């Protein structure tokens, strides 16, 4: 099962190829304990594709019958954020592969952002340049999300990317 945003459907075969060859191709961006992220070139774009940890037996069943996969939720939440005018990497697609028991593999693809840093860098470095201003703007951003009905339940330092805009704002 998969879904590709209309804007990227002309590249369906390339995107499917990135997924099917994920283990053997792409540029490794993050290798975590649970998930891996690789970068793939698609014409002038760079796609960021996250491969989620293969679920255990119970979660295979849960993700088949009771709960959407992490890849699908990432795609749907990013799409909702975009619809609300909240900055997030442009969602491209999600893919789910099932076996006879349930969910086997899942992938989420989005446009890769350049010149960004993780909120973690600000939290860990009290001397980070413009730290106080970034924290004020981050607080304002979080409040605006809440006002738009978004309750970000996983606001961990690694889940938030920050970019400096041309006007000097973050």
Locations of regions flagged by a protein language model:
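Catalytic activation segment of kinase domains across protein kinase-like and atypical kinase folds
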Residues: 158-170
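Conserved kinase catalytic-core helix
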Residues: 71, 80-87, 120-158
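Broad phosphate/nucleotide-binding scaffolds in NTP-utilizing and phosphate-metabolizing enzymes
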Residues: 1-13, 89
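Short coil/turn linker and secondary-structure boundary residues
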Residues: 10, 114, 126-129
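Conserved ATP-binding subdomain of kinase catalytic cores across diverse folds
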Residues: 15-117, 143, 147
């Amino acid at each position: 099962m998969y879904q590709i945003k209309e804007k990227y459907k002309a590249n369906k075969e390339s995107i499917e190829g990135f997924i099917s060859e994920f283990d053997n191709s792409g540029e490794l961006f993050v290798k975590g304990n649970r998930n891996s992220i690789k970068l793939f070139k698609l014409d002038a774009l760079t796609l960021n594709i996250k491969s989620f940890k293969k679920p255990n037996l119970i979660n295979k069943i849960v993700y088949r019958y009771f709960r959407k996969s992490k890849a699908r939720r990432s795609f749907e939440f990013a799409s909702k954020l975009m619809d609300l005018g909240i900055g997030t990497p442009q969602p491209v697609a999600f893919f789910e592969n099932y076996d006879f028991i349930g969910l086997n593999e899942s992938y989420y693809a989005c446009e890769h952002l350049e010149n960004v840093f993780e909120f973690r860098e600000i939290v860990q470095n009290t001397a980070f340049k413009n730290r106080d201003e970034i924290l004020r703007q981050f607080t304002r951003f979080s409040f605006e999300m809440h006002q738009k009905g978004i309750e970000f339940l996983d606001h961990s330092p690694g889940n938030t990317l920050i970019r400096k805009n041309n006007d000097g704002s973050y």
